[in-house]
């Protein structure tokens, strides 16, 4: 089997376990804290550093870092190490200062970006002052992970996010009785440290030991910095958009922020297992082809990526849509998280799932442009997405409540993907629309037997809340659905589902 296919499958496996741990974390958090005001404030505040990491670490920074690092690595190992050390040094100084400022001015920051006042503002500011420490840990971790990915080491670094969920779960079990909601805060910091430690140790093993290096005037670093600053604007817009969504949710009934946050976690399951796994493996290869000027292979990767996203996300989003009530009934409801909270979460999740395919394709198109060192086009599309998302959310929230926020995202991603498609065509990339539509048709055909399986299992007597009977039913339905899906792909002539990178593109 092709080594890139193997790498993708390994990343999918580790990401799957990471998401399962995330579900366990959400289940335990919801069981102990429910959808009350404290849980709302924690979820709202944690969403801020969790989003900031997209521009200060995992999103913008790694997208700017990896192409430059690949370029230096092709020159020599010494140049790659020098560039790596310079970026780490810059990270510690710059992001360390940002975190310090956030801690000092936690209260005015929370006053400005939230609707919380009085005691709720004091509580939110206190939680924020601790949680921002996570940004520094994850920003350093993301650089180490990028280095490992560049050397085709995917499995171990993709396993490290499990540590965050593990830290939160362990901390709640140990400290809930004494510290209440702050037990989750302790867990974020502890889990973030473990998440940093794993890729750090692996980088040491391949000869990337850090020591302070201040080559800030080197051309390669200035190129990285310029590209990163440009990308920050694009990622910042999407982050501000999501933060506005959470702010709008906080104006609705108590529990809305927690419901929205939980829906996002379950929505991110297929994103993490499939899209992020594919992008983790394919992006370094895209960057390599772009550096070498091999546009034919680069374009082949783009086209094959589109096909595999269609083949995966159409049936997966459909399965999650029809089974969402049963999944959340099993894994989320219980303790302080009521039937009403679970039903509301399922409703929001379904609205998110309508745009899952477009979300993944939007991110994939962004990766393509980052690989060719074009940060402007993704920025303009991010601006368009934000304008659409905010406008639809503000208009729709009075009519559709919390569901409007998820629908706004789905509609906005769909429009932006269509615009992205025509921009890519103008760049001269050849995309056979008939071939893509043929793959789309095959994916849609698989939905009929999948719904038949759902119709069969729906007739069973399901319990309310968690039970092993529900678990067995859901596992059986999942196994049968996956088996039937692969049979369908085989019958339809798609025998190599994960071979999205053609041999001629490698």
From Swiss-Prot:
Bilayer topology: Multi-pass membrane protein
Name the UniProt record assigns to this protein: Probable lipid II flippase MurJ
Source organism: Borreliella burgdorferi (strain ATCC 35210 / DSM 4680 / CIP 102532 / B31)
Top-rank lineage group of the source organism: Bacteria
Similarity annotation: Belongs to the MurJ/MviN family.
Function: Involved in peptidoglycan biosynthesis. Transports lipid-linked peptidoglycan precursors from the inner to the outer leaflet of the cytoplasmic membrane.
Single biological process term from Gene Ontology: peptidoglycan biosynthetic process
The keyword Transmembrane is assigned to this record: yes
One MF annotation (Gene Ontology) recorded for this entry: lipid-linked peptidoglycan transporter activity
Pfam families: MurJ
GO CC, any one term: plasma membrane
PANTHER family referenced in this protein's UniProt entry, alphabetically: LIPID II FLIPPASE MURJ
Intrachain disulfide bonds: none
Principal cellular location given in the protein's record: membrane
Membrane-spanning parts: 4-24, 86-106, 127-147, 153-173, 181-201, 232-252, 263-283, 308-328, 345-365, 377-397, 405-425, 436-456, 474-494
Keyword field: Cell inner membrane, Cell membrane, Cell shape, Cell wall biogenesis/degradation, Membrane, Peptidoglycan synthesis, Transmembrane, Transmembrane helix, Transport
UniProt-annotated location(s): Cell inner membrane
Pathway recorded for this protein: Cell wall biogenesis; peptidoglycan biosynthesis
């Amino acid at each position: 089997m092709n080594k890139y296919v193997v790498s993708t499958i390994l990343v999918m496996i580790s990401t799957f376990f990471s998401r399962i741990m995330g579900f366990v974390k959400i289940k335990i958090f919801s069981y102990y804290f429910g959808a009350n005001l404290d849980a709302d404030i924690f979820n709202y505040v944690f969403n801020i550093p969790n989003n900031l990491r997209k521009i200060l670490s995992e999103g913008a920074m790694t997208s700017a870092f990896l192409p430059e690092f690949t370029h230096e690595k092709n020159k020599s190992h010494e140049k790659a190490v020098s560039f790596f050390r310079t970026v780490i040094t810059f990270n510690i100084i710059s992001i360390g200062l940002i975190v310090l400022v956030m801690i000092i001015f936690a209260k005015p920051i929370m006053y400005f970006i939230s609707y919380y006042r009085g005691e709720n503002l004091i509580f939110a500011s206190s939680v924020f002052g601790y949680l921002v420490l996570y940004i520094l840990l994850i920003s350093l971790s993301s650089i180490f992970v990028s280095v490992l990915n560049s050397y085709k080491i995917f499995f171990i670094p993709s396993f490290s996010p499990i540590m965050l969920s593990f830290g939160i779960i362990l901390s709640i079990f140990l400290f809930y009785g004494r510290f209440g909601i702050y037990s989750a805060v302790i867990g974020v910091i502890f889990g973030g440290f473990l998440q940093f430690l794993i890729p750090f140790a692996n980088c040491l093993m391949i000869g990337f030991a850090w020591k302070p290096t201040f080559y800030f005037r080197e051309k390669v670093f200035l190129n990285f910095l310029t590209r990163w600053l440009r990308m920050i604007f694009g990622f910042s817009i999407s982050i501000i958009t999501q933060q506005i969504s959470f702010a709008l949710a906080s104006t609705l009934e108590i529990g809305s922020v927690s419901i929205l946050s939980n829906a996002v976690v379950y929505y991110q399951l297929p994103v993490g297992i499939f899209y992020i796994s594919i992008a983790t493996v394919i992006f370094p290869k895209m960057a390599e082809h772009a550096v070498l000027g091999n546009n034919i292979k680069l374009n082949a990767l783009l086209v094959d990526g589109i096909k595999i996203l269609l083949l995966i996300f159409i049936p997966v989003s459909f399965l999650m849509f029809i089974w969402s009530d049963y999944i959340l009934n099993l894994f989320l409801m219980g303790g302080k998280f009521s039937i009403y909270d679970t039903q509301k979460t399922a409703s929001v999740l379904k609205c998110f799932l309508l745009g899952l395919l477009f979300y993944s394709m939007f991110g994939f198109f962004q990766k393509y442009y980052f690989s060719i060192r074009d940060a402007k086009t993704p920025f303009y599309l991010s601006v368009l997405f934000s304008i659409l998302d905010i406008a639809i959310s503000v208009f729709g929230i009075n009519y559709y409540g919390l569901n409007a926020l998820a629908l706004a995202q789905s509609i906005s991603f769909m429009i932006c993907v269509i615009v992205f498609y025509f921009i890519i065509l103008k760049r001269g990339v050849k995309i056979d629309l008939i071939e893509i539509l043929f793959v789309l048709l095959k994916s849609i055909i698989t939905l009929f037997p999948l719904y038949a399986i759902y119709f069969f299992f729906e007739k069973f007597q399901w319990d309310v809340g968690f039970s092993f009977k529900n678990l067995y039913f859901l596992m059986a339905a999942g196994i049968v659905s996956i088996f039937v899906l692969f049979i369908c792909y085989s019958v339809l002539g798609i025998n190599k589902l994960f071979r999205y990178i053609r041999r001629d593109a490698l």
